[in-house]
Design a protein with these regions (language model features):
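Acidic metal-coordinating catalytic centers involved in nucleic-acid phosphodiester chemistry
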Residues: 1-8, 57-261
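Catalytic centers of nucleases
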Residues: 3, 10-73
Length: 261
């Protein structure tokens, strides 16, 4: 049971990240979005870049140690880009314990809770090892946003589906069973491209890719997300109900494959 729950949590974590990718792209207003860049998502405007790391720990109580490592990584990036216009954001969902984090962050709190740690029995003070002054840490903190009250898996997914319905003026069934699987497929393809330039996209290009895809899509990941009987019922209602005389070729469904005649 524990193994199964862990596997489910892992899958939900991936979906949570994919949904965040899609939301960042669809909510963007002229920015370029890079997936798996400096962080999970980089939002690049004409004047600055915000590097966002996403953490989804549905079964984990928040502790400072849970976010300390990604913050240390951000500090290392900051060390070599102090004069650049980078901002950093840690966006996370946790079961409980959020009241342990006092905001706004202070230099001493960040140094003590996030940048001081033990590794293999040795105590480290990362700010000292990186030769960063309190003024440097203060600048870093001013560029750092920590949000550990992120939306739940369900709420974020509902927001994405709502945005899909509004943007394409479609039904809930169409949003869930056509647009959402297609968006997942496109996001995954972008995020896993080995060339960083290809992992950068703007909203207009992303929308054009969706519009260009005319055929219904059965996404393997999406099929795993819901029970197969529920999925089949939705697809039948969407494409087959009240369409008794449908051309048999229109009934073909494949994993992103086109029907060629």
């Amino acid at each position: 049971m524990t193994h199964t729950r862990t596997a489910i949590d892992t899958i939900r974590g991936y979906y949570y990240q994919f949904d965040l990718y899609a939301l960042q792209i669809l909510e963007s207003k002229g920015e370029n979005i890079t997936l798996e860049g400096i962080e999970d998502v980089d939002v690049n405007s004409a004047t600055e870049t915000t590097a966002i790391q996403c953490k989804y720990y549905e079964g984990t109580t928040y502790n400072h140690s849970v976010i300390a490592e990604p913050i240390r990584w951000m500090l290392k990036h900051f060390k070599t880009h102090k004069t650049d216009t980078f901002k950093y954001k840690l966006y996370g969902f946790y079961k409980d314990g959020q009241d342990k984090l006092m905001l706004p962050l202070t230099v001493e709190f960040v140094k003590d809770k996030f940048l001081t740690f033990k590794e293999k029995g040795t105590k480290h003070k990362l700010y000292s090892e990186l030769e960063l002054s309190d003024a440097d840490i203060s600048l870093f903190v001013s560029r750092l946003e920590v949000d550990i009250n992120a939306m739940s898996f369900v709420k974020q997914n509902e927001l994405l589906l709502k945005m899909i319905r509004q943007y394409w003026n479609c039904s809930q069934i169409e949003a869930e069973n056509f647009y959402y699987p297609l968006i997942l497929k496109l996001v995954r393809e972008i995020a896993t491209d080995k060339i960083e330039e290809n992992r950068t996209i703007d909203k207009d290009t992303f929308i054009a890719k969706i519009i260009a895809h005319k055929n219904p899509l059965v996404d393997i990941w999406f099929a795993k997300k819901c029970a197969s009987n529920e999925y089949c019922k939705s697809m039948h209602k969407m494409y087959f109900s009240n369409r008794i005389n449908m051309n048999p070729y229109e009934r073909f469904f494949g994993s992103g494959a086109e029907v060629r005649g």
